[in-house]
A protein has these predicted regions:
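Structured C-terminal helix/loop/strand segments within mature extracytoplasmic catalytic/sensor domains
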Residues: 2-15, 26-42, 149-150, 154-155, ...
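Beta-lactamase-like hydrolase cores
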Residues: 26-73
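Sec/Tat-exported extracytoplasmic proteins
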Residues: 46-49, 86-96, 107, 136-139, ...
Length: 301
């Protein structure tokens, strides 16, 4: 079976994904053997960054998961917004929420970096769908806080992750406090392996209905904050559905789904913290991770 036939069998068309193929959990995966070429390349990328890099990659074609520092905790920063939007969609599937419901808020509710919500205070407000879109595509912090409030706060998001089988990911605070990224603080953290497994369940598995899964994928494909990270060095024809995160202490992240021209997805969780220097240097780390991930597909073609 060639890769194009494989993609067709997945039922993929512009990110439409068949369910059921990857429902088996792999929460125990932590690290690929240290002698593996992928690990060595990630180690070299980390060394040049001056920080601590954690990466997990799931190749849907081979079924292989690669991980470097896969079991170590890293600050999520805004990557949690993917999970929060997934939980909103889960509640829609359960009949507990409606994407058309309008949420009204005031100027006093605004927090730093709210490029979308700052224009809709007062009587107008925004729908739940609009808040999800703003949180994912623009990383709007107030939108994320309003979504958290809609389902009961950070603890409820953590509970959703536990019910989904993720025993590691936790959210404890709201924006902007969760971006503190203090070394050794377990609050608002995940591990690369746990996040990739959650992405498998949410984006490729049965956690969401087909309609909700497609909606989440569409929002992620429209993300406007990731051009310099995972997608920056990808070959022509690749598409990326991702969510970035940026915090204090030299922290920058990018997670999501890389779609080859044939449509076969790679799931990537790339977390970096403690990296000195300019933001552009941290962006470049994730760009190199994305290129490395894509090379796994290229080598198999």
């Amino acid at each position: 079976m060639n890769r194009r036939q494989f993609a067709g069998n997945l039922g993929m068309a512009f990110g439409t994904l068949a369910i059921g193929a990857w429902t088996q959990k792999s929460w125990g995966i932590t690290n690929t053997p240290s002698a593996h070429p992928v690990v060595e390349q990630l180690r070299q990328i980390e060394a040049k960054s001056g920080g601590r890099l954690g990466v997990a990659i799931f190749d849907s074609h081979s079924g292989q998961t690669y991980a470097y520092r896969g079991g170590e905790r890293f600050p999520m920063c805004s990557t949690f917004k993917l999970l929060a939007s997934a939980f909103v969609l889960k509640r829609v599937d359960q009949g507990k929420e409606q994407l058309t419901r309008r949420i009204r808020y005031q100027k006093a509710d605004l927090v730093p970096y709210s490029p979308v919500t700052e224009h809709h205070t007062g009587a107008g407000g925004m729908t739940v769908a609009e808040l999800c879109e703003a949180a994912i595509t623009q990383s709007d912090n107030t939108a994320a806080n309003l979504l958290l409030h809609s389902f009961g706060g950070p603890a409820q998001l953590t509970a959703y992750m536990r019910l989904s089988g993720d025993k590691m990911t936790r959210l404890d605070r709201i924006e902007p406090h969760l971006n503190e990224a203090a070394p050794g603080d377990p609050r608002d953290t995940t591990t690369p392996s746990a996040m990739v497994s959650s992405l498998r369940e949410i984006l490729l598995g049965g956690n969401l209905s087909g309609t909700s899964r497609q909606q989440l994928t569409d929002w992620l494909l429209a993300n406007k904050t990731g051009d310099k990270r995972l997608r920056a060095l990808l070959p022509s024809g690749w598409r990326v559905a991702d969510k970035t995160g940026t915090g204090d202490q030299g922290t920058a992240n990018d997670i999501g789904m890389l779609l080859s021209p044939d449509g076969a997805p790679l799931l990537v969780a790339s977390y970096l913290t403690g990296a000195p220097g300019p933001a552009a240097a941290r962006d470049a780390v994730h760009a190199q991770v994305g290129r490395l991930a894509a090379s796994l597909i290229t080598q198999q073609s």
